[in-house]
Amino acid sequence: MISFRFLLLSGLCALGISSYAETPKETTGHYHRYKARIQKKHPESIKESAPSETPHHNSLLSPVTNIFCSHPWKDGISVSNLLTSVEKATNTQISLDFSILPQWFYPHKALGQTQALEIPSWQFYFSPSTTWTLYDSPTAGQGIVDFSYTLIHYWQTNGVDANQAAGTASSMNDYSNRENNLAQLTFSQTFPGDFLTLAIGQYSLYAIDGTLYDNDQYSGFISYALSQNASATYSLGSTGAYLQFTPNSEIKVQLGFQDSYNIDGTNFSIYNLTKSKYNFYGYASWTPKPSCGDGQYSVLLYSTRKVPEQNSQVTGWSLNAAQHIHEKLYLFGRINGATGTALPINRSYVLGLVSENPLNRHSQDLLGIGFATNKVNAKAISNVNKLRRYESVMEAFATIGFGPYISLTPDFQLYIHPALRPERRTSQVYGLRANLSL
């Protein structure tokens, strides 16, 4: 587990070293979960903003000096002003994302149990993300450190017990139990010309396997089959490296490997790389820009090894397609599958539609409806006498924005033919997600 001492040390290092660079030049359209959060907060780069009238000093402690020189308290004390000052002084982009998600599930008594579970199930979510540009020059290229951490806590009933009561093979949210994972801590070097990037460190394929609204419980759909690749067996965060080829702004190709042991991403361990078991993957993304709007089409192929934490060797794949069919309509789909017996789902078919700011009221407003059918992996589920081969979920949500930082999202999930409750035709989950983004 990453300790607060480690996080504090990382923060002090970020403030203690001066960097003389511009903000990252991201190719647009290629979805990345953590960079998407930062880009949402920073729709325009610092480079494009008006120059500061505050003099900046260049020394070992210049970032600290520049923070005080920018007078973040002059318009009143606020976390937002302080973060903005830190970002400008250290050449970073920071996103702090908080979420509280109560979910009411029916039935709330597991099959064969006499006592009902407590409802709602309360999930607390916190995820800080940072992009720190160390340098950016025509001769040296661009060097960036990316960091993202996820903390999940439950009160009353956790997601595992709630799923068991509802009888679903897939989860009712993205994180079904208490966990802490280091999703990303990488250094990436983009060489002059922007064609080739080498990244080393800890990262997860969950960040790239998906599109704008079917890859992140925090900002889109909540049910696992609609917020993730439901058959994925890759790590939540593991050490390794990848090469990225970017021949133009519309095409991106990655080839990489990771150690096979750190399935849950709970620590940062280079030692695992000496154990000679590695996961490999290849990924390609295309982001055309037709007249109707931006789109993204991607394919991911991966293999994971058999290790004590995951008792099956797996070959998996994922096909994603998303397209703005109108200025405010975003259509997406996904087909994914995996071999082996690592997870209770070995194939999913997903289709959904999201309307962005449908009433021209607030930029965070969303209306979404999605449908997923999951093929159940019977060999991965034990202690169940009767089991359905397929399970489907229909989900609808509405995100309502309040000011620049807060949003509320009522959410409804209808599970049709829940796999672990063959005596029931449906199970239901109601949720209300409250987000705070700084």
From Swiss-Prot:
Q: Which GO terms describe its molecular function?
A: porin activity
Keywords recorded for this protein, A-Z:
Amino-acid transport, Cell outer membrane, Ion transport, Membrane, Porin, Signal, Transmembrane, Transmembrane beta strand, Transport, Virulence
Which range is the signal sequence, renumbered to this chain?
Answer: 1-21
- List the InterPro entries hit by this protein, alphabetically: Carb-sel_porin_OprB, OprB_sf
GO BP field: amino acid transport; carbohydrate transport; monoatomic ion transport
Naming one, the record's GO cellular component terms include:
cell outer membrane
Where in the cell? Cell outer membrane
Q: How does it sit in the membrane?
A: Multi-pass membrane protein
Sequence similarity: Belongs to the OprB family.
What task does this protein carry out?
Facilitates L-arginine uptake, as part of the AaxABC system. The arginine uptake by the bacterium in the macrophage may be a virulence factor against the host innate immune response.
Any other comment in the entry? Functions optimally at a neutral or moderately acidic pH.
UniProt protein name: Porin AaxA
